[in-house]
Amino acid sequence: MLLSGSSSQSLAAALAAATGERLGDVTYDSFPDGEQLVTVPPAVDGERAVIVASTPTSDAHIEVLQLQDAARDAGASEIITVLPYMGYARQDDAFDPGQPVSARAVARAISTGTDRVLTVNPHEDGVLECFDVPAAGVDAAPQLAAPLPADLTDPVFLSPDHGATDLATSVRDAYGTGVTDHFQKVRHSGSDVTVEPSEIQTAGRDVVVTDDIVATGTTMSEAITALDDPARVFVATVHPLLAGSARLKLARAGVEAVYGTDTIECAVSEVSAAPAIADAL
């Protein structure tokens, strides 16, 4: 049985359709002081419970822990926790003295209530090692090729840095044509950083900028404005957080369209990560 977090209801429904698993009747309540309460159906007794819940907020993390506890208490035979988007995963190190490794802290908490974890395109694969139970990544990047225009002109698929070229390659391979490259960050001083493409020529070509997460859109917008006269620019991201004025920044930088998956359910969630998750289950 699939048990959805409140932030992943559409994705859970798509996953139910893809797998044929029942979609549990979960209810979400809150108290006047802000505390949350979830309720799972008693029919989960003796069944495998697959919890599907992105955690873009701290409240969402609490909800996952409650879903796990409720499912276990209701008699679930096995619990698999699917984190389409894992919050705090970018804090995978103590970057300054006295700071926690937040990814490890939340992974340990989630591990206590589950038998296995799946998460979609984690920011760093090393995050998977933070869990105390078997954990695996799911690649939903190929899904992002589907909404791209079929008539891209000599397309270039760009990643934000060399370390993320695999994601750009996944989208390019799924699209079927084009080349991949990556932006380069050049640090001139402690606060002066410029972002520019490698040697690839973009003039007159369609450019697809790919990334696992687009949060504020600031760095990506700066990178896009550094491109040399591209024909069209599109952004494809697995996790479209698009915080604050991110969408406006990208539009002002010349981005024609933004395509994301439903790991974060929003207006640009053009494709679902459900097929990739279904394969992993």
Curated annotation (Swiss-Prot):
InterPro entries (UniProt xref): Pribosyltran_N, PRibTrfase_dom, PRTase-like, Rib-P_diPkinase, Rib-P_diPkinase_arc
Primary location recorded for the protein, binned into one broad class: cytoplasm
Active-site annotation: K185
Lineage of producing organism: Archaea, Methanobacteriati, Methanobacteriota, Stenosarchaea group, Halobacteria
Tagged with keyword Cytoplasm: yes
Gene responsible for this protein: prs
PANTHER family: RIBOSE-PHOSPHATE DIPHOSPHOKINASE FAMILY MEMBER, RIBOSE-PHOSPHATE PYROPHOSPHOKINASE 2
Pathway: Metabolic intermediate biosynthesis; 5-phospho-alpha-D-ribose 1-diphosphate biosynthesis; 5-phospho-alpha-D-ribose 1-diphosphate from D-ribose 5-phosphate (route I): step 1/1
GO cellular component: cytoplasm; ribose phosphate diphosphokinase complex
Residues that hold ATP according to the record: D33, G34, E35, R90, Q91
Protein name: Ribose-phosphate pyrophosphokinase
Cofactor note: Binds 2 Mg(2+) ions per subunit.
